[in-house]
Amino acid sequence: MDEKGRLPDAVVIEHPAHAGGHLGVSNLSDMHDPRFEFLRVLEELDAVFTSLGLRREDVPLIVAGGINSHEAVRELLSAGASGVQLGTPFAVTEEGDAHPNFKRVLAEATPDDIVEFVSVTGLPARAVKTPWLMRYLRHETKIREKIGALKHTCPTALECLSVCGWRDGVEKFGHFCIDTRLAAALRGDVANGLFFRGREALPFGTAIRSVHDLIELLLTGATRPAVAGRWAFSLG
């Protein structure tokens, strides 16, 4: 509730052990802390809402991170969530406007292909082990020692972050231009891009399916055969 007494439109509860991209924890070691488990958080929020004189339905609670099946959706809704939020499964749908290589990298990634690291924002992040990212992580310690405390001019002049480890010389943060790396991923540049991804398997495995098929699977559990002649492929 803000100073004017207004309630938030919704609250998103992200599980850092499963979600992709930037994660809501201070340290990499905190990702698997039991306090982030969805069922525990939803239960504890009941007590918080009661102490504030609120009902559960007053503020929608949306859970995010690793949700990849109809069964998972049902379990979370039954536990009191108002809805679910998915990122990676929608990013690899037919309708997604990213390069096919972007979708391939996300769809074919196995658990061993995914890594957690500290981003230029200072937050832990999760992404696929692409050639550039692994090269950066191999030299991360040396980079911090040599240039970590040095300030740099934003290479894109976009100033996309209020605080940036590379631009502002924050030694403990990551040191690279995140806008450049994300743009490379969107273009399908596998060698040089940063491909954020959640940790869990995707609903259709390595197959690229439509948004309609994905929503139908999540809501009903039904899996339709891929439509012949429609742009779709499998990497498995």
Segments the model singles out, each with a brief description of its role:
Residues M1:
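Short, acidic/polar
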Residues K4-A10, A79-V84:
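Glycine-enriched alpha-helix->loop->beta-strand junction motifs that scaffold or abut catalytic
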Residues V12-E14:
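Catalytic beta/alpha-barrel core
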Residues P16-F38, L42-D58, I62, N68-G236:
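Conserved active-site-proximal phosphate/metal-binding subdomains
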